[in-house]
From Swiss-Prot:
Catalytic activity field: L-arginine(in) = L-arginine(out); L-lysine(in) = L-lysine(out); L-histidine(out) = L-histidine(in); Fe(3+)(in) = Fe(3+)(out)
Effect upon mutating residue 301 to A: No effect on chloroquine binding affinity and transport
Location within or outside the cell: Membrane; Vacuole membrane
Protein name (Swiss-Prot/TrEMBL): Chloroquine resistance transporter
Transmembrane portions of the chain: 59-83, 90-111, 127-147, 153-173, 181-202, 211-236, 242-263, 315-339, 344-361, 375-397
Gene responsible for this protein: CRT
Topological domains annotated Vacuolar: 84-89, 148-152, 203-210, 264-279, 293-314, 362-374
Phylogenetic lineage: Eukaryota, Sar, Alveolata, Apicomplexa, Aconoidasida
Disulfide bond sites: 289-312, 301-309
This protein's GO CC annotations: vacuolar membrane
Quaternary structure and partners: Monomer.
Effect recorded for residue 289 to A: No effect on chloroquine binding affinity and transport
């Protein structure tokens, strides 16, 4: 029986490794054509074969990446548009959004989640893990909302790409991920591109942009990284329903956001600075702005002033769209981490930067935060895409090496069992 089990494992391993052997054959064909002095057209055809093979074997993850890319870009755009309308009331928008997420996730989970979850998962308490994730997410949301208020659209796309090296570092440190040289090279290409862009932008005068708020936005990436790693650890140990996880996290965030409310009293926040004695008034004005469309801050406000001007007319529509795309973003992110890994999510998320920069060119997408196209954006787009391709090549090499090691181990185990049977 043990011999048969080993034989089945070998068959499964060989089946999983088949696509890598086909890739090897394509590479060898390409090397042969180069040695034989193949034409330029033949070399191009060989490259397209490799690309087609990669896409065909990973069609699901590429479709999922396109869906995630679309949702993530729209989520970021509507977050910025919401802040431009009601940027004085970030706490109100954050709490309202958490409440909407909690209600929606609990309704859907009560209808569909219980049928999918097993009895062990339903009866086990994960409150500590849910609370940890909610604390990390709450820190990230508050910091991101503050940072986005004075961070221009183009710089947003650059800053968000820093999640790649941050995720790589902490996954290596905590989850014991191992990377290929090409993974590091791809990440370095992206980071260097970001550094050059930031250096260039630092010499430009941009009234809407603040280096302090840029740093706040960058700091919001660290709790996101730890939150994703916590999700992966829980998913690997227990089969937790994605809807239940997001519902409970949203519930805890209603309270964890209150713990971070004193952050708004920090004086360096300038336009977002909120003294303790004005907190309750700000909350009331925020609800009036969001649900009644009533402007409160209309005088002595604006760019460079102590306060942002309210633009509450139709704010609830923009906020509703932001909530919808953010809910979808959370679900897709959890699904990717559940079915794949934090590393896969990092690879997928790296494509949102250039897409976001280009999305800000179109008024029907960006609305009042539309930007003029710049050559610098296309330079960074090339850097992002080139770095992402190099990163993916490193991942393919690691996957191929892992498959071969498993196949060799199964082969050795089969030979050992055969020898023992013959000896007996």
């Amino acid at each position: 029986m043990k011999f048969a089990s080993k034989k089945n494992n070998q068959k499964n391993s060989s089946k999983n490794d088949e696509r890598y052997r086909e890739l090897d054959n394509l590479v060898q064909e390409g090397n042969g054509s180069r040695l034989g002095g193949g034409s330029c057209l033949g070399k191009c055809a060989h490259v397209f074969k490799l690309i087609f093979k990669e896409i065909k074997d990973n069609i699901f993850i590429y479709i999922l990446s396109i869906i995630y890319l679309s949702v993530s870009v729209m989520n970021t755009i509507f977050a910025k548009r919401t802040l431009n309308k009601i940027g004085n009331y970030s706490f109100v928008t954050s709490e309202t959004h958490n409440f909407i997420c909690m209600i929606m996730f609990f309704i859907v989970y009560s209808l569909f989640g219980n049928k999918k979850g097993n009895s062990k998962e339903r009866h086990r308490s994960f409150n500590l893990q849910f609370f940890a994730i909610s604390m990390l997410d709450a820190c990230s949301v508050i910091l991101a909302f503050i940072g986005l208020t004075r961070t221009t659209g183009n710089i947003q796309s650059f800053v968000l790409q820093l999640s790649i090296p941050i995720n790589m570092f902490f996954c290596f440190l905590i989850l014991r991920y191992r990377y290929h040289l090409y993974n590091y090279l791809g990440a370095v290409i992206i980071v260097v591109t970001i550094a050059l862009v930031e250096m260039k932008l630092s010499f430009e005068t941009q009234e809407e942009n603040s280096i302090i708020f840029n740093l706040v936005l960058i700091s919001s990436l660290i709790p996101v990284c730890f939150s994703n790693m916590t999700r992966e650890i829980v998913f690997k140990k227990y089969k937790i329903d994605i809807l239940r996880l997001n519902a409970m996290v949203s519930f805890f965030q209603l309270f964890t956001s209150c713990l971070i409310l004193p952050v708004y009293t920090l004086p360096f926040l300038k336009q977002l600075h909120l003294p303790y004695n004005e907190i309750w008034t700000n909350i009331k004005n925020g609800f009036a702005c969001l649900f009644l469309g009533r402007n409160t801050v209309v005088e002595n406000c604006g760019l460079g002033m102590a306060k942002l001007c309210d633009d509450c007319d139709g704010a609830w529509k923009t906020f509703a769209l932001f909530s919808f795309f953010d809910i979808c973003d959370n679900l897709i992110t959890s699904y990717i981490i559940d079915k794949f890994s934090t590393m896969t999510y990092t690879i997928v998320s790296c494509i949102q930067g250039p897409a976001l920069a280009i999305a800000y060119y179109f008024k029907f997408l960006a609305g009042d935060v539309v930007r003029e196209p710049r050559l610098l954006d296309f330079v960074t787009l090339f850097g992002y895409l080139f770095g992402s391709i190099i990163y993916r090549v490193g991942n393919i090499i690691l996957e191929r090496k892992k498959m071969r090691n498993e196949e060799n181990e199964d082969s050795e185990g089969e030979l050992t069992n055969v020898d023992s049977i013959i000896t007996q």
